[in-house]
Amino acid sequence: MMNYRHILVMIDLSPDSYSLIHKASFISNLHNDAKISLIYVNTDYSDAYTGLIDVDIRNIQSYRLQDINNMLKNLKNYIYFPVHKVFIGNGDMTSCLLDVTQKYNIDLIIFGHYQDFWSKIVFSLRQIINSLHIDMLIVPFY
């Protein structure tokens, strides 16, 4: 059986992140209190949208950063174990995950996957699986 040393939990701004963190805590306890880190990857309009858009991207990013900070504050109240690191990535999800997993010796990543039509189009699970060479726990959300 693999002994995990550093678990990365990919969170979003939804309450579903709490269940991912709970799973990470459970797995960490089974593996001699493996370190747990969190990552949020911001893939907003400025990075993902290629067409014409008539909005002020800086305002969207500012609101999104405020949402992220609020989410992280709420998570601190929920989490009863030490969080090793918190990462906020921007842009391509696969690149951000690859960078963090290599630099910080992550050996397990936990993330959720929504089972709806749009998520199948937007979220490229295959690209992540083919790029990251570590164990993954994919938790389906319905």
From Swiss-Prot:
Described purpose of this protein according to its UniProt entry: Required for resistance to DNA-damaging agents.
Entry similarity comment: Belongs to the universal stress protein A family.
A family per Pfam: Usp
Protein's recorded name: Universal stress protein A
Coiled coil: none
Keywords recorded for this protein, A-Z: Cytoplasm
Keyword Cytoplasm included in the entry's annotation: yes
Transmembrane feature ranges: none
Lineage, broadest ranks: Bacteria, Pseudomonadati, Pseudomonadota, Gammaproteobacteria, Enterobacterales
Principal subcellular localization: cytoplasm
One GO term describing the cellular component: cytoplasm
InterPro entries: Rossmann-like_a/b/a_fold, Universal_stress_UspA, UspA
Domain of life assignment: Bacteria
Subcellular localization(s) per the UniProt record: Cytoplasm
Subunit organization: Homodimer.
Record keyword Cytoplasm present: yes
